[in-house]
Amino acid sequence: ASDVYKRQDYKDIQLSVSSARIIPSFFTMHDLSTLYSALLKLRYADLNIDWTQNATLSRIIAAEMLRGRDYLMSDNNLDSFLYAMNNKVAMTKDIPVLNLLIGNYGDEEMEATLDINSRSITNSQIIIAGATGSGKTNLLAVLIQQFRMLSTESQYPVNFLLFDYKGEFSDIQNNHWLSLFDVDRSCILDPLTQPLPFTPFKDFTGRSINEINLYSTEMSSALCSIDRVSASANMNNRLSEAIVEAYKSTNGAPISFELMLKCYQSRMKDANNDDSISSVLKQLVNAHIFESEDKVSLIDDSYIIKMDGYPKDGPIAKAIVYFLMSKLNNIYELLDKQAVNDEVVQIRHFSIIDEAHYMLDFDNRPLRNLIAVGRNKGLSIILATQNMSSFKSKGFDFYANAQYPLIMKQQTIDDKVIKDLFGVSGQELQEIRTAIAGLQKGELIIKDQMAFALGMGNKYKKINVTHLI
């Protein structure tokens, strides 16, 4: 390639915010780092590039991969490559086995693992209840590290989306944590400094008006719920109509909060006299937390959303989580079923919501939908909250839909939750209460599925969680 061509390439790579990032382990996998280094330095020999910058290196690698893609897609090059490598069957067999090693069982020094994707597992959801100081953050880190370690060097990497309510994972002081998850600081998104690079709204281009009507009703309910708005029937109808009108004006393309507010105010008697709905919409407009279009794919990479700049129970924090869960729903509706082989199914992505109790006290339909149907598309969700009773919401039983409820140290112990979760009463109930009360930092109890099925022995096991961070 000419020098001019290479210079233009590098300029494009620098300016491309949406360029794919390649995980750090890519450069050391199969001991090929020396070869990669030599090839890159030879190709870009005339440019002054700082090769120590992971973000720059990742984008250059991505550009080279795209160049390779263009070559493979021309003529019959791809078919020739697949035939030569005999790789079609190997790709399916390469689905990683996600047996997450999270610690050991009590004093037995026996490894404690969570089977996430074998074909016998009905779902892949994990819920965690642990009070402040229970070791919940470390457990989340262990789970993320295991998902990534077991998958990133395969052809089926499992990416993640973490809502960092406390700002611990995005804290520069904890920068060394990121390498444990095979990411760097470019994965951290701070909506206080820059809008999140996604539109939260669904694309209805070419779809029926009935679909928009249904969506507008759901969206109206959500906007009222995230700030506990007391909205009259007229206000709800007005908001639904405003959403439909906004979509009509974009011919079904994703709308914005600004357009929604404008359409809503046009239906108010006095647009200068805010009601509770226009007040919420103005907060969302002023916060400018989302872009008006997708600039990156939410599931094709890993992201940490820095949330500590917003009140945890405020409308902005709730809107971020709600609308990104809704976004995941929209994405997964369009995906094919995940890859499967004789032993395991593919897990594409997992979302982690810490301080999840703030998202469980209202009818969070996108979250419920993801938990209910996510397994069929290769999605896992990890919810963490401080109190075990938070997962017993009025409209949805999160315990019944979780494969692995993990109970850590509690401030208050809910007998009803224990009865439902472990199927115990009387003396067995007291034993589990005592076990929970005696948990120390970094310890948890989990239902013993075998004892539960046989109806004999202790209905729980205690796990000492690996100390990672």
Language model regions located:
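Short, small-residue-biased leader/transition segments that mark boundaries at the very start
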Residues: A1-Y5
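Short, positively charged interaction helices/loops
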Residues: R7-Y44
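Phospho-regulated, low-complexity intrinsically disordered regions of nuclear gene-regulatory
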Residues: S33-A84
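Basic- and hydrophobic-enriched, low-structure N-terminal and domain-boundary segments
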Residues: L72-A131, L139, L150-E153, L454
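P-loop NTPase motor domains
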Residues: L101, D107, V142-L379, K392-K394, ...
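P-loop NTPase motor core of the ASCE superfamily
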Residues: I116, F391-I469
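Conserved lysine of the Walker
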Residues: K136
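H-loop/switch region of ABC-family ATPase nucleotide-binding domains
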Residues: T385
